[in-house]
């Protein structure tokens, strides 16, 4: 049985090194691996001994914490319906018969959409308070950055197409988008910002060199969006440090997207994650491989902020944006007549929808290398609900 356990854990640890694919699980034996300190010798007394003091029971460890999520499995968390203008119909030929001014409930294209890519990279200081070489209470303080990519449907990219309203009266018409632009890509680059986490880990059961342990962790950060890219044929644009409207319904203010826009706020994402895990390790001299399972929940909430495409406040050369013509047929309508704007996308906007975990369960495999019972380096890989790698280097005082 011992040989089988050794083989499984060693194989898992070696596999993690060749398939590095949030919050780490960590070695369940970590509270008891470093039993000596660089300044003070460790104490292996009995906690039931009346002569033992808390000074004998407590120790500190510090080190580096690096966590690198290459792909978090996320999906949107939105309602099934979305409020916007009525969709064009087959009776709208040269242009819309009636321009949309009233919101109607339409199927939400963002509902249940999966994100194509979600990355997050964290570098932090690690501090742990150890009790009786069995329990750890720890925290991390550092910085995180990230990247999100998804189909434009996940972000409710919409615009107005086919309007018959003339440009001279467009600003006062209070029109709303009627077309969902679902065949495009949206990218979000997240700036580097402060991040923290807290947790606890316990070695619950030991038998020889095997240790069964459990941990619980919580992490939080609130980064801002550094750059927003919309890769869409009908309306392509990039915004550095985007701003938008929180809780705003259509129609947006006609100044939205211009330098004169007011009432906007920076686009930021409130990140929360908590995780519970159970893991088994087996010590082989200076190596301690382990394998664990985890259950976690993560959310990215941007308050459903609505961001408008950048545009000019006043038309230059009869245009306020560089959106291309869409229909590609017929003659160009002269300025000052109906349908002069019908063939280009107008008042384009998107919103940053709330996202959450698409899968809650995952596995982790890793190994810890201990030197002189004072220093340790842990390498870990996580799979299923995310593809991630973790590195932790620490020493005991």
UniProtKB/Swiss-Prot annotation:
Q: Tell me, which GO biological process terms does this entry list?
A: monoatomic ion transport; regulation of cell shape
Gene Ontology CC, one term:
pore complex
**Alphabetized GO MF terms:** porin activity; structural molecule activity
User: What is this entry's stated membrane topology?
Assistant: Multi-pass membrane protein
Signal peptide: which range, if any? Answer: 1-22
Q: Where in the cell is it found?
A: Cell outer membrane
What's the main place this protein lives?
membrane
Q: Which Pfam families match?
A: Chlam_OMP
Give the record's keywords alphabetically: Cell outer membrane, Cell shape, Disulfide bond, Ion transport, Membrane, Porin, Signal, Transmembrane, Transmembrane beta strand, Transport
Q: Family assignment?
A: Belongs to the chlamydial porin (CP) (TC 1.B.2) family.
Binding partners and assembly: Part of a disulfide cross-linked outer membrane complex (COMC) composed of the major outer membrane porin (MOMP), the small cysteine-rich protein (OmcA) and the large cysteine-rich periplasmic protein (OmcB).
Q: What does this protein do?
A: In elementary bodies (EBs, the infectious stage, which is able to survive outside the host cell) provides the structural integrity of the outer envelope through disulfide cross-links with the small cysteine-rich protein and the large cysteine-rich periplasmic protein. It has been described in publications as the Sarkosyl-insoluble COMC (Chlamydia outer membrane complex), and serves as the functional equivalent of peptidoglycan.
Q: What is this protein called?
A: Major outer membrane porin, serovar C
Q: What is the lineage of its organism?
A: Bacteria, Pseudomonadati, Chlamydiota, Chlamydiia, Chlamydiales
